[in-house]
From Swiss-Prot:
The NlpC/P60 domain, residue ranges: 406-524
NCBIfam families: PRK13914.1 (NF010495)
Species of provenance: Listeria ivanovii
Low complexity biased stretches: 155-165, 284-311
Name of this protein: Probable endopeptidase p60
Domain comment, as recorded: LysM domains are thought to be involved in peptidoglycan binding.
Chain's role: This major extracellular protein may be involved in the invasion of non-professional phagocytic cells by Listeria.
An annotated GO BP: proteolysis
Length: 524
């Protein structure tokens, strides 16, 4: 009898073991079911897509029903970062196709919860709110341990003791509620809006500085002799007019030396004597930047020869005028305006101008030729063969098409330049704020060309061309990993005008944050 019981007990034990085994296996693996995604499984199991792919040697996000996936734990350590852009959009998902939840100001600290496959971060901010941001706009990584330390200080001093090495002063300043304020204010007091100069910090832009100091982008570029809106960390900028002026008397006093007089005889000074008082503010800085190196080393006169008078194009710099450029290249103001389709003498720093070429001449000749064949045709109706006038007619129509195409590109870029410095907003259609495709659609519409609303649709509807074929007025497209997500207007020389997070501005299509995402060009 006892033997029978032992046999039954052993059999029961085997049965229990047989049913228990799958339960243990399911603790570290999961079987994919219809409708499952890596992202959904990661959320359900408290891990990340990257961790799942690494654990299972997956090269893509594709999974199939019945597939077994190994589940691994994710390191619990999180990182704290700060926003480096002026404003950073927080979205409901990892990519620009998701809706904007809110926008965080530059310098705001966030906690990185996880990293997505496309370079986006899931973050937490404020009072436990979460969202997704583009990782390239976050910087200054620190371990996120300080957050719990602040709360522990309010409960027990014994627990807060380890923080004494890094924050002894904070502990002595009693209430823990002071800590967030102290951290927030450490960045703002650094900006003294009454100061006349400012040292550039990470995340700064000329547009943001102009807002802080109550001036314009153009003024800051002018006072600092900047040829583009690019600035670098540590650069000292004049943000008040007096800062630009204080440097000029020193340079003028020392230009009385015979060496300086040779430089003064250049066309630049002739231009300055003829310009209005408003432009005189720009000219002294140009002298300041040119002369200052001369005191340190004699090779300073190098800036003058940098203008290649044999070049066919010229990039506008601070203090330039059409008259000055025409004198430098031995041409006339009217010819430069005709070459570039300009209706006024207004120029923008960074604008690329044609200074040589045959477009105006070709237009003049084509018009005079158009008259000549007409006269000949009328006078020689019976004696001249009809083939000659028809040839002339075709030649003239082709010439007019070429000139109208050039004028169209020039007017399109001129329209784009009108909006430099305007703010970015997702879904912005203009004219006060834009997003990238809203900007291109608006500018092209002003030239009579209708574009689709999104960057992806604009890419699909354009004729694809290589970079060597690209001309000013063509579209340039970028892909951040989930398809076409950004578009700008190409202006030549590797530059584009586009609406991005920092507003409407010039950018180098091969520069940092752009070159690696460049897809190509399109013509409409």
């Amino acid at each position: 009898m006892n033997m029978k019981k032992a046999t039954i007990a052993a059999t029961a034990g085997i049965a229990v073991t047989a049913f228990a085994a799958p339960t243990i296996a399911s603790a570290s693996t999961v079987v994919v079911e219809a409708g499952d995604t890596l992202w959904g499984i990661a959320q359900d199991k408290g891990t990340t897509v990257d961790a799942l792919k690494k654990a299972n040697n997956l090269t893509s996000d594709k999974i199939v029903p019945g597939q077994k996936l190994q589940i691994t734990e994710v390191a619990s350590e999180k990182t704290e970062k700060s926003v480096t852009a002026t404003w950073l959009n927080v979205r409901s998902g990892a990519g620009v196709d998701n809706s904007i939840v809110t926008s965080l100001k530059g310098g705001t600290k966030v906690t990185v919860e996880s990293t997505e496959a496309n370079g986006w971060y899931k973050i937490s901010y404020g009072e436990g709110k979460t969202g997704y941001v583009n990782g390239k706009y976050l910087g200054t990584t620190v371990t996120s341990a300080p957050a719990p330390e602040v709360k522990e200080e309010t409960t027990t001093q014994a627990q807060a003791a380890p923080a004494a090495e890094t924050k002894p002063e904070v502990k002595q300043s009693t209430p823990a509620t002071v800590l967030p304020k102290a951290e927030t204010k450490t960045e703002t007091p650094a900006v003294d809006t009454t100061a006349s100069t400012y040292t550039v910090k990470s995340g700064d832009t000329i547009w943001a500085l102009s807002s802080k100091y109550g001036t314009s982008v153009q003024n800051i570029m002018s006072w600092n002799n900047l040829s583009s809106s690019s600035i670098y960390v540590g650069q000292v900028l004049a943000v008040k007019q007096e800062a630009a002026k204080t440097a000029s008397p020193k340079a003028e006093v020392k230009t009385e030396a015979p060496t300086a007089e040779k430089q003064v005889s250049a066309p630049v000074v002739k231009e300055n004597t003829q310009t209005t008082t408003a432009k005189k503010e720009v000219t002294p800085q140009k002298q300041t930047n040119t002369q200052a190196p001369a005191q340190a080393a004699k090779p300073a006169p190098a800036p003058a020869p940098t203008v290649n008078t044999n070049a066919s194009s010229y990039t506008v710099k601070s203090g330039d005028t059409l008259s000055k450029i025409a004198t430098t290249f031995g041409t006339t103001v009217s010819k430069i305006k005709a070459l570039n389709g300009l209706n006024s003498d207004n120029l923008q720093v960074g604008q690329v101008l044609k200074v040589k070429g045959t477009v105006p001449t070709a237009n003049t000749n084509s018009n005079s030729n158009a008259t000549a064949p007409t006269t000949n045709t009328n006078n020689n109706t019976s004696n001249t063969s009809t083939s000659t006038p028809s040839k002339n007619t075709n030649t003239n129509s082709n010439a007019s098409q070429g000139s109208s195409s050039t004028a169209s590109a020039s007017s399109l870029i001129a329209e784009a330049q009108k909006h430099l410095g305007k703010a970015y907003s997702w879904g912005g259609n203009g004219p006060t704020t834009f997003d990238c495709s809203g900007f291109t659609k608006y500018v092209f519409a002003k030239s009579g060309v209708t574009l689709p609303r999104t960057s992806g649709a604009q890419y699909a509807s354009s004729t694809k061309i290589s970079e060597s074929q690209a001309k000013p007025g063509d579209l340039v497209f970028f892909d951040y990993g989930n398809g076409i997500a950004h578009v700008g207007i190409y202006v030549g020389n590797g530059q584009m005008i586009n609406a991005q997070d920092n507003g409407v501005k010039y950018d180098n299509i091969h520069g940092s944050g752009w070159g690696q995402f460049l897809v190509g060009f399109g013509r409409v």
